[in-house]
Amino acid sequence: MTIRIPSGEEADYTLHLPRILCLHGGGTNARIFRMQCRVLERFLRSTFRFVYAEAPFAAQPGSDVTSVYKDHGPFKAWLRCTAADPDRSAQEVVKKINLSIATAMYDDDMRGATGEWIALLGFSQGAKVAASILYAQQTIQQRLGERAATRPRFRFAVLMAGRGPLVWLLPETSSGPGSIPMGLVDAASPSMLDSEPELPTDSTEHMLRLPTLHVHGLRDPGLSLHRRLLRSYCQSDSVSLVEWEGEHRVPLKTKDVTAVVDQIYALARDTGVLDSWC
């Protein structure tokens, strides 16, 4: 399931625009995330086309979701949220995530969109998955070089309230001893782990070096974990940071959203998506 910009003239002019693939948090869905991102999308819709992917697994919504969106189910997740959730193999999780992403992209192509896929934008569990997708892309580029050019090449990711560790999403090597870089976890692991894996002291293999923008609410109970994702899993010269006075949610006030918008435009310019401010 993908959630689209409304049909009509408003939809038509976005068909050629660079596309941002949006990944919702655990226990919500694409429709809810579209509503949560409504202000951000309004500021950026003249330059970028937002496409919302739906996670593959049924999930229980949190109280913060049901208080506002209780009538907007079914609720979905990308990963197991807790150890109480049904067990699934890492291979199954990776396969279903890849299928959800591919379906969202294919559906948008079938609606006539032609813009390059240039970025990922995720919130909470969706941010973890977005960072992990970017890490998988980085790994593929390192291994295949120019042969990886036929795959979608995301230039950067916007990570809102994302926590580590990164998840190993390469299906051909997602199981077996020694197949996962130290510091990462396989896709069968619950995403709300109380503890994170030990990080290597003599290697930076676990580090994401492609550009990321981190958006942190300063009143978010998980702020320390979000900062750990930035500091421990993302190379320092590739990160940008926006902090705002908010809880665990997507910014809605104009002053907070414009700070995020400014950094997205800056990343788009720096990565060659835009030659100048649009």
UniProtKB/Swiss-Prot annotation:
Pathway(s) this gene product operates in, as recorded in its UniProt entry: Secondary metabolite biosynthesis
One GO MF term attached to the UniProt entry: hydrolase activity
Name of the gene encoding the protein in the UniProt record: dbaE
InterPro entries in the cross-refs: AB_hydrolase_fold, FSH-like_dom, LovG
GO annotation terms (biological process): secondary metabolite biosynthetic process
Function statement: Esterase; part of the gene cluster that mediates the biosynthesis of the antibiotic 2,4-dihydroxy-3-methyl-6-(2-oxopropyl)benzaldehyde (DHMBA) and its derivatives. The direct non-reducing polyketide synthase dbaI product is 2,4-dihydroxy-3-methyl-6-(2-oxopropyl)benzaldehyde (DHMBA), produced by condensation of one acetyl-CoA starter unit with 4 malonyl-CoA units and one methylation step. The FAD-dependent monooxygenase dbaH is responsible for the synthesis of yellow pigments derived from the oxidation of DHMBA. The roles of dbaB, C, E and F have still to be determined.
Keyword annotations of the record: Hydrolase
GO cellular component: cytoplasm; nucleus
Organism field: Emericella nidulans (strain FGSC A4 / ATCC 38163 / CBS 112.46 / NRRL 194 / M139) (Aspergillus nidulans)
Induction of its expression: Deletion of the conserved eukaryotic csnE deneddylase subunit of the COP9 signalosome leading to defect in protein degradation results in the activation of the silenced dba gene cluster. Expression is positively regulated by the dba cluster specific transcription factor dbaA. Expression is also controlled by the transcription factor flbB.
Any Pfam family the entry gives: FSH1
The name this protein goes by in its record: Esterase dbaE
Catalytic residue list: 124, 220, 248
Family per record: Belongs to the LovG family.
Enzyme class per UniProt: hydrolase
